[in-house]
Swiss-Prot record:
GO terms for cellular component: mitochondrial inner membrane. Residues 1-60 form a transit peptide. Residues 59-70 have a biased composition (Polar residues). The keyword Amino-acid biosynthesis does not apply. Residues 50-90, 100-119, 320-343 are annotated as: Disordered. It holds the Pfam family RsfS. Probable mitochondrial mRNA stabilization factor. PANTHER family: ATPASE SYNTHESIS PROTEIN 25, MITOCHONDRIAL. This is ATPase synthesis protein 25, mitochondrial.
């Protein structure tokens, strides 16, 4: 009978209810039915499936019937907890019975492919052009700059609209520019021009030739010059030309307008296509939007009024100044009857104006260049006296210099204790009392305390004193600059080096990647700007070396998006940083390197050591080896210090593959250097540390007498260390 009853019930859900009723009598628990979770279907789906429609109507009756049939049994003790039933139903709902969510998750690339909104009164061609650039050509991150209100207009033309887009590669950049020009010619009958675009086969041929030259240079053992040769510029500017402009609001034409020709009515559209790296480097949006805000007619009139008032005030002050500087005794008359207040003459001395503290550093436009002999015209009457401090530099007294030198020789903790509690502390320690006494005894130069204060704060900042800040150092430099004395180049470089120094590590020993803050870099750049106006060459190798080091991290780092192999211990010796911060440092490095190449900055051995360490710590191995090989091309000898640094960096990094390549390639090259680099005790220690990274069992293999490259090199270094200890003993 049960078989006949089940055969009559065609719905699977109804069969489940019947079986559930029999199992409940036997006190057997059964998972909650799946159809209890409400499931909605569209109207079209209900009409398309008769069986599902019939099942839904029959299921409702069976549900009510089964519920009523189970009520008496549930009262007898077979009741289930409602929370457990709902929890089981949530766990056992299959994917084909789940409700479809109305909210569709956004695509990760959707924001990059969005089309910017149209400006007010757009040209008729603009909407179709944006659609074609985004959909058909495939440029990402489109931005639109409406420059039609610029006054004066940009050099590209009046009523300019600029579209900026990012190409996915250099090949995509050339293909996109070529297709856009062809589309404009065929569809809109325009004559666009594309600056930087190469032909379809020209780019392929030039890239093939460049790859061939690079391969030949690599086989010959020389470095390939990767300067910009015009092939891979990463930037193409497509000038669409003059198109019909949108209908603008009627404006009154200026009555006093003077000029030739008619006012331009059409709009100029320019499409800037760049690669992602080139767009981040140029930052066209920031250049056009931030530094040059649009000026309306009212703003221009207000500016003209302010300028006229400023000009009248300047003329009045100049007239008062001429009257005040005239000779009160009068001037002998001449037959010509000239106004001697306007007479010109020749100066034989230099007049140094009084300079305020803020104008000395933040606005030093009127500071004379050091060492410049200016021949000016003497005024009628007594010549103004020249301050004696402007003719010679300010030097420290021997007692003050000796105290500062002693501070650098004592241990760091003792030096910090002797410096007291800050710049305002003058008598809390014996050193500060002796320092103030030495300043008071310097009677021959009462302004010596200005330079002494600067040097004291500089030493404190270099020692990482907690109560001496870099702002105090900058204020001391401003006071020294306002005093009128000449600032030597060594004093300025020491100040910049202290401002660009890294902060001390945390006392709790937390591993964080330290960087110089942007505010400290701004202070250092202000000092360099002031010194450039005084005649100092700030494009020197020392300045670039300090800026290059301050732009990065203090310790070895790696981006968090990289997944090194678990067998390598490189993860233990490098600190993970965010990919955005890592890319920012790389971008600053590239810009500094391009500036150095443009000005042909020649580095010395000390700067090369700093650059090599910097690039290796930041994982820029290609640039590290490019600088290493460039030294031989510049005929700079790679001395013992360079090879000690090379092997120590690979040993500290802990990468087995790189350590093995370094040992096999550069240990034999030490004997070929001019002059040759011998393996002494210092070199032997770093080579043995590098050997332990490349082969952790090299010591046991060498003790067992195994033949091989690494055991023999280990024995050689061990013998050098034994001989060195015997010589010292």
């Amino acid at each position: 009978m049960n078989r006949i009853m089940l055969r009559g019930i065609q719905c699977y859900g109804c069969r489940s209810h019947v079986i559930q009723s029999f199992l409940a009598i036997a006190d057997i628990t059964f998972p909650a039915p799946l159809y209890h979770k409400p499931y909605t279907r569209s109207h079209l789906q209900h009409q398309s499936s008769f069986s599902s429609l019939h099942g839904q109507s029959f299921r409702g009756q069976s549900v009510a019937h089964s519920t009523s049939s189970r009520d008496p049994l549930e009262d007898n003790g077979t009741e289930q907890h409602p929370d457990s039933a709902s929890h089981q139903s949530n766990e056992h709902v299959p994917w084909y019975l789940r409700e479809e969510s109305s909210e569709v998750p956004p695509h990760p690339l959707g924001s990059r492919q969005s089309i910017p909104p149209l400006p007010d009164n757009p040209p008729p061609i603009l909407e179709g052009l944006l659609q074609h650039i985004s959909v058909d050509i495939g440029l990402d991150d489109l931005s639109l700059l409406d420059l039609r209100s610029r006054n004066p207009p940009p050099a590209l033309g009046a009523n300019l609209i600029m579209i900026i887009g990012t190409a996915r590669s250099v090949k995509h950049l050339n293909v996109a520019a070529d297709r856009l020009c062809r589309w404009l010619r065929s569809t809109h009958k325009l004559h666009p021009t594309a600056d930087g675009l190469l032909g379809r086969n020209e780019l392929k041929i030039k890239l093939r030739r460049k790859a061939r030259r690079a391969k030949l240079s690599s086989n010959a053992g020389s470095a390939f010059d990767e300067k910009d040769d015009g092939i891979i510029t990463g930037w193409i500017c497509v000038n669409v030309g003059s198109v019909e402009n949108g209908k603008a609001a009627a404006t009154e034409q200026k009555q006093d307008f003077v000029g030739f020709g008619s006012v331009a009515d059409g709009a100029q559209i320019v499409v800037q296509m760049l690669t992602e790296e080139k767009r981040a480097e140029l930052d066209l949006e920031g250049l056009w939007s931030g530094n040059f805000p649009p000026r309306s007619a009212s703003e221009i009139r207000m500016f003209e009024q302010h300028f006229e008032a400023f000009a009248e005030k300047a003329v009045a002050e100049a007239a008062n100044g001429r009257a005040a500087h005239r000779d009160p005794r009068g001037v002998r008359g001449t037959g010509s009857g000239m106004d001697h207040g306007q007479r010109r003459g020749l100066h034989t001395i230099r007049r140094v104006p009084n300079i305020s503290v803020e104008a000395a550093v933040l606005g030093p436009a009127f500071i004379p260049r050091q060492g410049a002999t200016v021949q000016q015209e003497p005024r009628l009457g007594p010549a103004p006296s020249v301050p004696p401090k402007a003719s010679k530099p300010l030097n420290l007294s021997p007692e003050t210099a000796s105290l500062l030198h002693h501070l650098t020789q004592v241990p760091k903790d003792d030096a910090i204790r002797e410096l007291g509690s800050g710049p305002q502390d003058l008598t809390s320690t014996l050193f500060l009392r002796l320092f103030q006494e030495a300043l008071s005894n310097a009677e021959q130069n009462p302004d010596a305390h200005i330079l002494a204060k600067l040097e004291l704060i500089r030493v404190a900042v270099t020692l990482q004193h907690p109560h001496y800040s870099k702002t105090d150092l900058f204020d001391a430099f401003k006071e020294f600059a306002a005093s009128g004395y000449d600032i030597s180049e060594s004093q300025a470089l020491k100040t910049v080096k202290a401002l660009l120094s890294f902060a001390e590590n945390d006392p709790d020993g937390s591993h964080t990647a330290k960087r110089v803050s942007r505010s400290d870099i701004d202070l250092a750049l202000k000092v360099l700007n002031h010194m450039s106006l005084r005649g100092m060459d700030i494009l020197s190798r020392e300045v670039f070396s300090m800026l290059y080091t301050a732009s990065g991290f203090q310790v070895p780092v790696r981006p968090v998006n990289e997944n090194p192999s678990p067998s390598s211990i490189e993860t233990e010796t490098s600190i993970p940083v965010s990919a955005e911060e890592f890319d920012e440092v790389r971008l600053v490095q590239d810009r500094l390197r391009k500036i150095m190449d443009a000005f042909d900055v020649k580095f010395g051995p000390d700067q090369f050591l700093t650059l090599l360490r910097f690039h290796f710590h930041h994982g820029n191995y290609d640039q590290f080896w490019a600088i290493w090989r460039k030294m031989s091309l510049l005929q700079l000898p790679r001395s013992k210090e360079f090879y000690v640094l090379l092997f120590r960096l690979h040993a500290e990094r802990g990468n087995q593959k790189r350590a093995a390549e370094c040992l096999s390639s550069w240990v034999p090259m030490m004997a070929r250097e001019q002059p040759a680099v011998a393996i002494d005790a210092d070199v032997a220690r770093v080579i043995m540390a590098c050997l332990l990274v490349a082969d952790p069992d090299v010591k046991q293999r060498a003790d067992n007498g195994d033949p091989g490259e690494y055991p023999s090199l280990w024995d050689r270094c061990w013998n050098v260390l034994v001989a060195s200890k015997a010589t010292q003993g």
